[in-house]
Amino acid sequence: MNCIKVYLILLLSGLSVIVKAQNTITALVVEQETNQPVIGASITVQGNKTATAFTDNTGRFTISNATGKNITISFLGFKKLTAKAQNNATYRLVSTIAKVGEVVVTAQESRSLGAASVIQRHAMEHLQPSSFSDLLELLPGGRSKDPRLNAPNQIRLREATPPSNSQYATSSLGTSFVVDGAPISTNANMQRLKGAWETLATARENVNEGVDMRTISTDDIDKVEIVRGIPSVEYGDLTSGLVKIERKRGGNDLNARLKADMGSKLFYLAKGFEWANKWTLNLSTDFLDSKTDPRNKLETYKRLSVSARSGRKWSNDKTLSDFKLNLDYGGSFDGVKSDPELNYGNEETFRTRFNRFAISSSYSIKAKQQGWWRAFTATLASSYEQNTSERTRFIQLQRTTPAVYLMEDGESDAYLLPYKYTATQKVDGKPFNLFMKVNTTFSVPVKGWYNSLLLGADWNMDKNYGEGQIFDPFKPVYPLTSLRKRALKDIPANHTFAMYMEENIKLPIAKNRLELVGGVRFSRMFNIDGSYTVAKQFYPDVRFNAGWTFPRFKIADKFGTVRLAFGIGSHTKNPTIDQLYPENGYLDITQLNYYHSNEDYRRINVRTYVIDRVNKDLKPARNFKWEVSSDVNYDGYRFSITLFRENMTSGFRSVPVYAPYSYKEYDATGINPNTLTAPPSLEGLPYTVVSELFSRDRTSNGSRTLKEGIEYTFSTKRFESIHTRLTINGAWFKTTYENSQSVMVRPSAVLNNRQIGHVGIYKDNDRLTTEMANTNFTADTDIPRLKLGFSISAQCLWFTASQRKPLSNIPDSYMDASGNVHQWQAGDENDATLRWLVRDYNQSYYNRDVVPFSLNLNFKVTKKLLRDRLNIAMFCNKLWDYTPDYKSGTILIRRHVNPYFGLELNVKL
């Protein structure tokens, strides 16, 4: 009897499970245009007033008791879809901005809570870029610029007019570039020609300044998302922004692109392969040849890129898997040389050769059915570079010049350089990077609302295996510079570990929707001496975004939505290898400089000090952001506006640090040149011991960058009668640059044949505010019947302004020649020596400099031929301009711009 009861219970339980399974529906929601999953879409079953379920991070949802009923699927930025509930169905949502197949040639604001712009392939093709730098024109606040490929191109997000010096380069260093999930690391880049003072060499340096955008080709890119706001805690080692690049995959087309403009020529070739078993392979190469002036063949820049990308997808009833493997080569080559006919037959050159080899792979697996575990992703990436910078100069000296190569503290006689020689200095750098990352996503199945929990960790290693500076110390390229050799491979590797967690919630409240994304990231540097501050703790980054979507409204039978969003968060960028381990400074002080008409009797004696330039108190740069935004959609029209503020008070900068150094001043007046048979001996030669202040450069957290502004974008739907859409975007930026730590300054005044022996310590030495406002009006027309598309863009720069803030003329304290620090007292300005520490900045130094309105008109056109296999495109920037003259004080400033145009040919077979 008991067995029968147990059997009946099991039978009834099984039947209930079967009935429940039959009433449970699992389906997929994707974008109709891109076939990408829609995450967080709400599903409402007929008869219910609130959402029954939300799609997960794979775009899937599961609902019960809905068989045969209608369901309504809705998501911000897409048209509502009402359809019959069916198991294993795929529902496609149509964007309210663009119809299927419609060409969008401008950047679009992302649907995410943080401020971000998405640039699709169509927009890049219409823009006709030569490098990634050209894409920044599409951002709010962006403007077209002539390509400048003879120097590194750094990214500066949300800045008005950045200073040209490197003291505020943390903004570009702190912008992370991620290509197919793998970050591009520049932390081991130490490719700097030491001692160089010529613009020819220094203008091509990119140490501690982030990614050089010239090196990134755009032809393989399928989509770019540039996050200016608060990114996910998944991404770290950044302060200013995030650039996520996704490259093309699949297809079977053979593509070729040829482009020529006023400064460069570009060739691109790519072939895609796609097999039935879901394997894909993409091969591509591109070559760019640029000249700053086409008439000058002595200054060139070349870029070569080769890429092989493979992938495969697997699917079963429970999971969807995706594997990707990328192999990449990138070469970047700068070259400048002088004309021997203008240099007395001597050729002078400067060359750089950057060769980057990269491999990356990723594997992801996602659950199709709803449950606690949703997805897992693992990424492994590595890159290796072989970089050289080489300078050759013909040296002509006018006087006896010493060369010192003592590697330790002490006294020595200098080698006397010949008056004429040819010298070469080379930098050998071999940066290596290894990156690993794992992510796991969980979701708590709760009826009526969507949630996901992201847990992850990443590890990053950077090291440079190069030889460093290679030169002949007795034939220096830059005489009178205290230069020594150091092998870069002897510097320890940087190891950074981070772990993070982030919760994402979408919750319906009445007919509203609340979105919350909050997380925390902890990062720490390892393999570093415990005496360094950065080795003692984890640095937390807390980031939070929230959005509130109001109920859908209806005006004139048209529907619209309004969303308000808010974001706040901190962002951390760790110091680079060059900043943590700067090479020693060498101070060579001349003690005796005896000249004799006979070269064999000359003698220069020097005192050498080896100066440790390491700053163990150096901390990561940290940026605190907040932003408020609104996004309004109505009948295909969209308006978004963002108010933001960013305050980074601990940016990296190089500061002078003074200390006293003693040396001997020999009195050579008693030497009888007529009795010498050898260089004069120092024994018995009278001397005076002198103490003097000398400086060494040290990296500190002394730069503050304050960004404030408004960004906005308005786009219309395409007006069918004229086939035209209007896009208006622009920004107002106000940026303040100043030092956030005290600065030491030694006046150049001379008293009694000596430079002033005191150093003033000032609370401020650099306070500059820049401002700009612009608006771009773009009308793009697409006529499918004629296979013709063109756009006209009126780029209005309403004004730019800069103003230095008042600086303190009187120091807070000062250092005497012995190294003692004294507080500044009232009346010190009357002291015969100390009065030279009082700076004299007149009011004109602080005048606001305003450049008034200017307008550029740009034109682009594309024409498809031969059944879309051939595409001819042309652009002309500054086709027409309005740049009136203006006055700055009493000075008349005349402005003039030149058009810049180009033509390209695209073939698809």
Name every feature range the model reports, one short phrase each.
Residues 510-511, 665-808:
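Gram-negative outer-membrane beta-barrel transporters
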Residues 91-92, 203-255:
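A beta-strand signature from Gram-negative outer-membrane beta-barrel systems
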Residues 490-638, 642-647:
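Structural signature of Gram-negative outer-membrane beta-barrels, strongest in the C-terminal barrel
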Residues 133, 137-195:
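Extracytoplasmic beta-strand/coil segments of soluble accessory domains associated
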Residues 7, 648-650, 654-656, 796-839, ...:
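C-terminal beta-signal and adjacent terminal beta-strands/loops
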Residues 42-60, 103-130, 152-156, 192-206, ...:
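N-terminal periplasmic "start-of-domain" segments of outer-membrane beta-barrel proteins
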Residues 314-332, 352-531, 537-541, 552-554, ...:
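Face-selective signature of the C-terminal outer-membrane beta-barrel domain
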Residues 28-34, 41-46, 72-78, 86-126:
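Short, acidic, small-residue-rich periplasmic hinge/interaction motif at the N-terminus
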